[in-house]
Each structure stands twice: as C-alpha cells, then as structure tokens.
Design a protein with these regions (language model features):
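N-terminal intrinsically disordered, low-complexity, charge/repeat-rich segments that act as generic
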Residues: 2-107, 243-264
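Short amphipathic alpha-helical segments that mediate assembly, nucleic-acid/protein binding
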Residues: 5, 27, 119-120, 211, ...
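Mixed-charge, Lys/Arg-rich low-complexity intrinsically disordered regions
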Residues: 110-146
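Short coil-to-beta transition motif at edge beta-strands of beta-rich domains
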Residues: 142-157
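Conserved hydrophobic/aromatic beta-strand scaffold that supports enzyme active sites
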Residues: 152-154, 163, 178
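Short beta-strand-centered aromatic/proline hotspots
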Residues: 160-171
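Short solvent-exposed strand/turn elements
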Residues: 173-198
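Long, low-complexity intrinsically disordered regions
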Residues: 197-264
C-alpha cells in the first residue's frame, strides 16, 4: 500500500522540525499562488519560486558545517523538506536525491523505528512520483511568535550575518530594527555595542528609520538556524537619532521577503 506524506512526516519523530518546515512551505506556496497572475503561471514556475524561497532559510541547515549541525538533523531536514514540498505539488531533483540519501543514512544509523525502515522503498517511490499541486491553496496560518521584546537576534542570509533588536511584538509579529553591521561570520552581542541603527535611503536622498513587522519569525530557537538569540531583556535597541522620521511606524514583511531583500 502506498504511503502518504503525513505518514512519512510522523515517522521522522521530529514534530517541531516538521511543523516549522511545513509552515514555511505553506507560507511560500500561498504567496506564490495568490493574485490573478498566479493562475496564468505554470506549476513548474510556481514551484521554482517556492523552492528557492524555502531554501533561502533552510540552506542554513543543509549547507551547514558538519561541526555545527548534527548530520542526522541535516538528513531529517532534507527529507522533511522534500516531503512537505512534494505534498504541495513541488519537487526539486537535487533535494529529492538528498532526501533519498537521507533515508539511507537514517537507516544506517538506526535513527528511526522499524516502520520507517520497512517503508523506505515506499517513501522513495512517493518522492520520485510526479508531484501534483492541490486544487486549493494552503490556508493563511495565524501569526504567532515565541520571540519577545528585548531580544537581540542574529540573522544569516547566504554567507552574511546581520543582527536586529525586537522593539515589541504586535499581532503575532516581532517589530524589529537592524543594527548597521554585516559580516561573514556570526555576530555576538559584544560586537553590537555602540553600533547604530541601519536606515533606509528614500528618494529625497535622506536616511530614514527602517523598522519592520517580521511575520513568519515564530520558533525560538529557530529550527532552521537562520535566526539565533544573541541577548535578551535588552530594553534599548540601536541608536537611531541620526535617522529622519516618516509617517509610517513600520513596514510589513515576512522572513522570506526580508531574506530576499538582504541577499548580497
């Protein structure tokens, strides 16, 4: 009997990881399928966009130094990503191959139960079968976050590292302000002392306060390792007195759009 996507995800025995990946895939799939233009796009085009956006976050695990992330966690991540994407009608040959290799590695390490071992061929067959996009878009999930006002957070985008301060939480989204610093290695709280706030240059040539409601930043710690807590209980964020003010309090975005905006 064929195995279902949810059955595979349950066999991974990693509820938190699966929840995070499934939520990210559904968020990206929803946005890619919204609007009148989406109906004119080929499923393969939508799939390419979704996979690229999802991997912007989860490559922090898939491409991590083995000394920093346990190999079995990487394998579970690869398999969960492939299954969640396939469930929404998307597939990537390279990720599918990584997921199949993960099945072999997880079995070799006896990391999961006998049912996973017995159904391994069925899981591979599922992943290599044509992915069919569901007729209905994924629902918009209710916003929530485990991050708190006063948290200072490191953020990885490709091979660069940024940091921001959570000013407050509003309607399930952290309101964040970035420190004006970026470097190729992870930041530490000590490196942020005296660093001013990063501004946004507008058409008038002036630098303005740049704050964002960052939806999709939910889990703490972050299972994707893209966001890391550097400090907590920090009442004062980066100094922004050098920046001009405008009428808006903050811009609404999410972790994927913000990540794209920060790409080198």
């Amino acid at each position: 009997m064929a195995i279902k996507h949810l059955d595979v995800l349950k066999l991974l025995a990693a509820a938190g990881l699966v929840e995070a990946i499934d939520g990210d895939v559904k968020r990206c799939a929803l946005w890619a399928r919204l609007g009148p233009e989406a109906a004119k796009r080929e499923p393969a085009q939508i799939g390419t966009e979704v996979i690229e956006n999802v991997l912007l976050r989860w490559n922090c695990i898939l491409q991590a130094d083995p000394a920093e992330v346990a190999p079995l966690y990487v394998h579970k991540t690869a398999l969960a990503l492939a299954v969640c994407l396939h469930r929404q009608g998307f597939a990537d040959a390279q990720l599918t191959d990584a997921a199949v290799a993960a099945i072999v590695a997880l079995n070799a390490a006896v990391a999961l139960n006998d049912t996973f071992h017995r159904r391994s061929a069925d899981i591979e067959a599922l992943l290599r079968s044509p992915a069919a996009m569901p007729a209905r878009r994924p629902p918009l999930l209710k916003a929530h976050t485990a991050w708190r006002a006063g948290d200072v957070v490191g953020m990885q985008v490709a091979d660069r590292h940024h940091a921001f301060h959570v000013r407050e939480v509003s309607q399930g989204a952290p309101i964040v302000e970035f420190y004006d610093i970026v470097q190729p290695s992870p930041l530490a709280w000590e490196q942020l002392q005296g660093v001013i706030a990063r501004g946004q240059r507008l058409n008038d040539g002036r630098q303005y306060v740049d704050r964002h409601a960052l939806y999709g930043l939910q889990h703490q710690p972050d299972p994707a390792h893209q966001f890391r807590l550097l400090a907590s209980g920090i009442a004062q964020g980066p100094d922004s007195t050098h920046l001009a003010r405008h009428s808006g309090l903050y811009a609404v975005t999410d972790v994927f759009r913000m990540t794209r905006d920060l790409l080198p």
